[in-house]
């Protein structure tokens, strides 16, 4: 199973926070993904990039905050995250990278 270049565009980066680290005990990994990526695309990309079996994908969109910088109003970009559940016996070490 070789990774296609488009798979690297779908999975942007791993999320390394306290909550995301606690989810690894439940065999789940959290990734930032492209805003227009669908669940089947995310599943295929993770399976090909990390050579694991994915059982479920849950997604969420965090809306960007409104900010004022030097008197100008702006808004940060929305961020889409995917919580990927792995099959038993499969693990991903996100600290090593690809």
UniProtKB/Swiss-Prot annotation:
Listed PROSITE patterns: RIBOSOMAL_L23 (PS00050)
Gene Ontology biological-process entries: translation
Gene Ontology cellular-component terms listed: ribonucleoprotein complex; ribosome
MF term (GO), any: rRNA binding
Function statement: One of the early assembly proteins it binds 23S rRNA. One of the proteins that surrounds the polypeptide exit tunnel on the outside of the ribosome. Forms the main docking site for trigger factor binding to the ribosome.
Family, similarity comment: Belongs to the universal ribosomal protein uL23 family.
Oligomeric form and interacting partners: Part of the 50S ribosomal subunit. Contacts protein L29, and trigger factor when it is bound to the ribosome.
Protein name: Large ribosomal subunit protein uL23
